[in-house]
Amino acid sequence: MITPLQPREFFRGVWRGEGELRPHPLLRIFLPVQPFRFSCNVTWLSDSIWTVDDRFDFASGRVLKRRMFAELVAPDRIHVTADDMPGGADILLHERGFRFTPYYALGAHREGGRVYRLRCFDECTLDDRGFLHDTIRIYYRGLPVATMRIGPVDLGRDGAA
């Protein structure tokens, strides 16, 4: 199985999956659980730099698109930046997945609504079948507000579907 420690082979093609954004129980009165479909398209620009185009299609009809720029800065570390990710983050690679260093993301409650600076803790793990599972714990001013789970994500490899 190809692992994240082989970034040129691992981070490629189109990834697809489903997930949900699950607000903290105390917030569910105002914010319902939001299922979504996820796709990610990776385009390599050089031997060490690539773009990641993420798309989230929520059941409510809302569509969220973002582009990240990624650079391999060490054999086991990638640095990523995006317009909604002030300061970016590092991705630490290991054989069974990868995790982001804690990062800030800018998120709006509703389309065109107020933008909040959210602290995110993001971990991705590979299961034995080669599918990726991503869990993002989201905080606002130190308080937990939501957890986003994506997976299983089909990495588009032969035999993984």
Regions found by a protein language model. Name each.
Residues 18-113:
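Central antiparallel beta-sheet cores of small beta-barrel/beta-sandwich binding domains
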Residues 1-51, 57-59, 131, 135-137, ...:
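Amphipathic/hydrophobic helical signal segments and adjacent flexible N-terminal regions
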